[in-house]
């Protein structure tokens, strides 16, 4: 039985798709005004794992991840760069795809852009106005009136906003003036800003209405999972629920799923705070597997803190897994009776518990190392299991030899020195002078080399 934590209910609930053989997922995507940082990566990596795991379990998936390609941030940056907003967003979308490809993240089934759904957005706004859930402010903006939605605050558990607005209504505040907590559905454009024609004048959509209209258009008003980072719970997802439910009372999402924040020195990592680490910078400094391990070694709902120490620990952990695959045939198709797969499934069925899943992977790794010389066939069988399960989490996609060796990074003189020490160690081993042999191994470790003794001889690779 699979359970997923539902933010709306604040508890884990049994997951059963609305349609028995397909899982429909909508995730709020990026606003392409700058390069993606590892805060974005955490959400994107997690939902990639979710989709891969559903597919592993035999479900078909329909994964929608929107792109907010019109936004104040895009307009402001384009203005300062003296270029058209759409050229900026197009360029950043290409850069996003480059980063996600470097992390081996699958593309969604559909990646709708807001600017391609203006008509759907206008239609939903018209309905909200007709049903008296929205009003036109003195500035001409179309604004959603949250006091008209009785369950406002249910997702975020922030009910004070609703209470405040009800008091405002009781005290007969002028509704032509936008109230503090109400949010814009359609924003009137300023001169020289990008805009679209509407019944209320030229303007552009507000942030929250975009996802409501696009999810309704692509998945309908009832679907399985809506997700994003935990910073979207309020106000974005709270507002989405309000406007979607008011536009169509049948609207329902079974599970609201949110990832925890990536922290940097006790602050949320974000571009606006100037403390973000770009995906491409981290991949270049470490590698994709190390970054993905760091992002998934803690439970997806918890906060994680980026630090050099945590990245080095992640790098070391990934290398341990690759070392166990080293000198094995992980494409070995002979079936094996093993307990690890069921334990891995139990972990993932428990709200995608990747830390527990990793403990299973490391158990397999230890078994592979144990059987490498004693029973190579069993080691090969277990390597196949490790490779297949790791690929669900999205790691161990590289060839172990090429990942571990990187011998080209050593100079020719250093490689000769390494080979000389290995030869000396082998001579000590033949003479059964184990302490001296161990001293030679320590010398290699000191210069950044790890050894593996196999039936074929001693292999070395870079730490």
UniProtKB/Swiss-Prot annotation:
A motif ('KMSKS' region) lies at residues 268-272. ATP binds at residue 271. The keyword Flavoprotein does not apply. Its cofactor is Zn(2+). One of its GO terms (molecular function) is ATP binding. It catalyses: tRNA(Cys) + L-cysteine + ATP = L-cysteinyl-tRNA(Cys) + AMP + diphosphate. This is Cysteine--tRNA ligase.
């Amino acid at each position: 039985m699979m359970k997923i934590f539902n933010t709306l209910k604040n508890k884990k609930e049994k997951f059963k798709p609305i349609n028995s053989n397909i899982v429909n997922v909508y995730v709020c995507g990026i606003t392409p005004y700058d390069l993606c940082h590892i805060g974005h990566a955490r959400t994107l990596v997690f939902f990639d794992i979710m989709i891969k795991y559903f597919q592993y379990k035999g479900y078909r998936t329909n994964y929608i991840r929107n792109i907010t390609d019109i936004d104040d941030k895009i307009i402001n940056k384009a203005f300062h760069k003296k270029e058209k907003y759409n050229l900026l967003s197009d360029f950043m979308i290409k850069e996003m795809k480059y980063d996600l490809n470097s992390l081996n993240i699958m593309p969604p089934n559909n990646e709708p852009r807001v600017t391609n759904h203006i008509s759907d957005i206008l239609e939903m706004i018209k309905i909200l106005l007709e049903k008296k859930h929205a009003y036109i402010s003195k500035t001409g903006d179309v604004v959603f009136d949250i006091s008209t939605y009785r369950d406002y605050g249910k997702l975020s558990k922030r009910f004070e906003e609703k209470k405040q607005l009800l008091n405002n209504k009781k005290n007969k505040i002028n509704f032509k003036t936008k109230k503090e907590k109400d949010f814009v559905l359609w924003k009137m454009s300023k001169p020289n800003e990008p805009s679209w024609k509407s019944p209320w004048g030229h303007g552009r959509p507000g942030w929250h209405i975009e996802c409501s209209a696009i999810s309704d258009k692509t998945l309908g008003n009832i679907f399985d999972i809506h997700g994003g980072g935990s910073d979207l719970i309020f106000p974005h997802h709270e507002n989405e629920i309000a406007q979607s439910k008011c536009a169509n009372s049948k609207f329902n999402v079974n599970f609201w799923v949110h990832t925890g924040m990536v922290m940097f020195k006790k602050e949320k990592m974000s571009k606006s705070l100037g403390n973000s680490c770009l995906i491409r910078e981290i991949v270049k400094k470490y590698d994709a597997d190390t970054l993905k391990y760091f992002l998934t070694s803690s439970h997806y709902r918890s906060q994680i803190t980026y630090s050099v120490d945590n990245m080095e620990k992640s790098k070391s952990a990934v290398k341990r897994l690759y070392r166990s695959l080293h000198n094995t045939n992980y494409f070995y198709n002979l079936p094996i009776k093993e307990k690890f797969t069921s334990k891995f499934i139990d972990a993932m069925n428990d709200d995608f518990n990747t830390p527990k899943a990793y403990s299973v992977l490391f158990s397999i790794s230890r078994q592979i190392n144990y059987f490498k010389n004693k029973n190579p066939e069993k080691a090969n069988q277990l390597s196949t299991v490790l490779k297949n399960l790791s690929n669900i989490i999205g790691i161990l996609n590289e060839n172990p030899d090429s990942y571990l060796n990187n011998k080209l990074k050593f100079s020719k003189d250093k490689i000769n020195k390494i080979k000389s020490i290995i030869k000396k160690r082998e001579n000590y081993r033949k003479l059964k002078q184990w302490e001296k042999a161990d001293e030679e191994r320590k010398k290699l470790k000191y210069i950044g080399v790890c050894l593996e003794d196999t039936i074929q001889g001693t292999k070395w690779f870079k730490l």
